[in-house]
Amino acid sequence: MKIVAVEPIGISPEKAEFFKTEYAKQGIDFIYYPDRNEDPNELKKRMFEADIVIVSNIPLSGDILGCCPFLKMISVAFTGLDHIDLQYCKENKIVEAEKTDVIRTLSG
């Protein structure tokens, strides 16, 4: 399984490295990008192999999501889903969730 945080989502690179190490013990790859990049082509590259994507408010269109053959879940690190193509998610059985407590959990 591969979890991809496509942007910093409020955690430090050190904390991301800690999660990468802990997830690896469970056979899970955790990929963290320390920069925010909204370019659709870059997002497609970052998300291509992801089973789970963690994002804040970067827009994720059906075009971008359509390039992610393994995607099963999008976790929004803040509130609101209006930047996610929910129709695409529904049609492709991708679970979307907003998690206001993700940042507390990751940074605590």
Language-model-derived ranges and their functions:
Residues M1-A50:
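N-terminal glycine-/charge-rich "phosphate-binding" loop or analogous flexible N-terminal tail
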Residues D51-G108:
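Phosphate/diphosphate ligand-binding glycine-rich loop within oxidoreductases
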